[in-house]
Amino acid sequence: MTNIRKTHPLIKIINHSFIDLPAPSNISAWWNFGSLLGLCLIIQIITGLFLAMHYTSDTMTAFSSVTHICRDVNYGWLIRYMHANGASMFFICLFLHVGRGLYYGSYNYFETWNIGVILLFAVMATAFMGYVLPWGQMSFWGATVITNLLSAIPYIGTTLVEWIWGGFSVDKATLTRFFAFHFILPFIITALVVVHLLFLHETGSNNPSGLISDSDKIPFHPYYTIKDILGILLLILTLMTLVLFSPDLLGDPDNYMPANPLSTPPHIKPEWYFLFAYAILRSIPNKLGGVLALVFSILILMLFPLLHLSKQRSMMFRPLSQCIFWILVADLFTLTWIGGQPVEHPYIIIGQLASILYFTIILLILPTVSMIENKLLKW
């Protein structure tokens, strides 16, 4: 009798994706983040579902409904903080996952990479709308500032913003629709994840050397399932340490004040994972220019396959490119720090220089260094 795992129409798909999948024998811990992102998505959907059972998307009661969840619902505080800090863990894994793709040249799988960038946009949109829901000061003003950016679009901008708001300011209609979108997007993300995996399994995984690994494959189970379980345990340990010891470490104290349209917080800033993009936005004095730079700072990821001029796929054997890559990482840390600082000297000029460096490294320095390395190979 043939194994049901290999014959059943549904189980067969799971088998080919997670059990008998041929995987390169040399993929490192940097390849763990795909499964960790899957876990983060599951955690967010489950905790989010339980939060939605008690949350009310009305401007009068939203803030107190979150308070009610934390005080009166059984383990409500745990669910709420797992959801809030789960988003931070999600983005840490996302950034590391994208960084891995850049370092090892995984972007040469065009379809997988482009779906991944679309996923990044979708997760960022979901996180932004989720941040608005508790209806604290930073929720309200963050929503006002970020949605207002669309007014920079010529001709249709103002109409577009009022259409998104559902009125002439961020109000009840805005909160209700943000809740609706925040609820539906994770399911759209899940569907996109399936497409992402579908494209990945068409080509097979990349590996640290960037070389074709068809001659040396091992089954995904048990080798990489056990490796993923280690990553999962470490992720849960980190998340629960954060949730149980300092749940507000990454949050903003201003969000414990109910939203007040008449009082602007001294420093409006988004959650930490958007700070690098926020710094790029602020570094350009022109509104439309800033918005374009903000969008392009993420969209530029789609250009990587076109900007890849090296004869080698991975950076494993390219020390010059490695140096530039880590300078780019340091630059992103700098931008994240600047995004959280007030708009004053010397932060303004540091932010502008870091923004210029970000685009210069990606569009100019990395391709040039790749060509120099190609020349060095001939010596």
Swiss-Prot record:
Name one matching Pfam family. Answer: Cytochrom_B_C
Which Gene3D superfamilies does its entry note?
Cytochrome Bc1 Complex, Chain C
Enumerate the subcellular locations listed in this protein's record, separating them with semicolons. Mitochondrion inner membrane
Q: Which GO terms describe its cellular component?
A: mitochondrial inner membrane; respiratory chain complex III
The protein's superkingdom reads Eukaryota
Q: Give UniProt keywords alphabetically.
A: Electron transport, Heme, Iron, Membrane, Metal-binding, Mitochondrion, Mitochondrion inner membrane, Respiratory chain, Transmembrane, Transmembrane helix, Transport, Ubiquinone
Q: Which cofactor does it need?
A: heme b
Its GO biological process annotations read: mitochondrial electron transport, ubiquinol to cytochrome c
Record-linked InterPro entries: Cyt_b/b6_C, Cyt_b/b6_C_sf, Cyt_b/b6_N, Cytb/b6-like_sf, Cytochrome_b, Cytochrome_b_C_euk/bac, Cytochrome_b_N_euk/bac, Di-haem_cyt_TM
Q: Where are the transmembrane segments?
A: 33-53, 77-98, 113-133, 178-198, 226-246, 288-308, 320-340, 347-367
Question: Any idea which GO molecular function terms this record carries?
Answer: metal ion binding; ubiquinol-cytochrome-c reductase activity
Q: Which residues bind heme b b566?
A: H97, H196
Provide the residue positions that the database annotates as binding heme b b562. H83, H182
- PANTHER family, from UniProt? CYTOCHROME B
The subunit field of the Swiss-Prot or TrEMBL record says: The cytochrome bc1 complex contains 11 subunits: 3 respiratory subunits (MT-CYB, CYC1 and UQCRFS1), 2 core proteins (UQCRC1 and UQCRC2) and 6 low-molecular weight proteins (UQCRH/QCR6, UQCRB/QCR7, UQCRQ/QCR8, UQCR10/QCR9, UQCR11/QCR10 and a cleavage product of UQCRFS1). This cytochrome bc1 complex then forms a dimer.
The record's function comment reads: Component of the ubiquinol-cytochrome c reductase complex (complex III or cytochrome b-c1 complex) that is part of the mitochondrial respiratory chain. The b-c1 complex mediates electron transfer from ubiquinol to cytochrome c. Contributes to the generation of a proton gradient across the mitochondrial membrane that is then used for ATP synthesis.
Membership in a protein family: Belongs to the cytochrome b family.
Mind telling me what this protein is named? Cytochrome b
Q: What gene, per UniProt, encodes this protein?
A: MT-CYB
